[in-house]
Every structure is written in C-alpha cells, then in structure tokens.
C-alpha cells in the first residue's frame, strides 16, 4: 500500500501506476526476473474520513451501496480498485509475471460485479489458461 492508516493523506493506495512503477523497480533496478514477481491486488479500500481517521472497507460493501461503484476507483475520500483497474492490472501481470495475488478474497462482491470474476474474464480474454494459476 502506498498510503493507509499510517499516512492519513487521502489518495489511492494501490493504483495501476503504482503497480507499473513497482514492477519496473524490481525488474530494472533490482534485476528480478519478471516470472518471479506476483502482482498483489486489493479487494479492500481505505476511507480517509478526516486528517486523523482512516478506516478500511471491503470492495463488496462499495458495490452493495451502489453498483456503479464497481467501475470507479474512488468515491469521495474512499479509495479502492474497481473492475477497470483490476482488469488493467491483470493485463500488466500477464506480461511475463507469475500472476496475481489477491488480498482478501472474502472482501469481494459475490455478485456479477465480482473482482475475482473480472480477473478470470480478463485472463480468459487474453487467452491465458487459468486452471493452473492457483498456488499452494
């Protein structure tokens, strides 16, 4: 996370650009083989209520309050990853990375707005076989 309760400055904690820069750092500055990198994606967000209070929430709760939130990355001072950002991160991870890691699966929306379903659909659309993507 690039921001959160330890840094109550409102902003995106896990943007696409943060992911891209992080991957670039590990590949180009440190020399890690991309196939050894796994991209973590959040199924949660942070609500920067004021300058001293930051609370976490689930992606599912955002969709429960308004299904159009699934297409956004923030509502006011609530920051999270919506379906378009998750799909773009999957495309990024499909460029020779080992895959996607989800924190926290139980925070998903178990509806047609599911982030897990977005991940599966994006990998499928890219022609990536998904049956062997689960680790131990």
Named regions from a protein language model:
Residues 26, 33-39, 77, 92-93, ...:
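Generic detector of bulky aromatic hydrophobic side chains
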Residues 1-64:
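Substrate-binding surface in catalytic domains of secreted glycosidases
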Residues 16, 20, 65-70, 128-131:
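Short, surface-exposed, polar/charged, turn-prone segments marking secondary-structure boundaries
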Residues 41-99:
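Hydrophobic, secondary-structure "cap" segments at the distal end of domains
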Residues 82-136:
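Acidic/aromatic/glycine-rich contiguous surface patches that form carbohydrate-binding/processing clefts
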Residues 21-27, 73-77, 133-136:
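Low-complexity, flexible helical/coil segments
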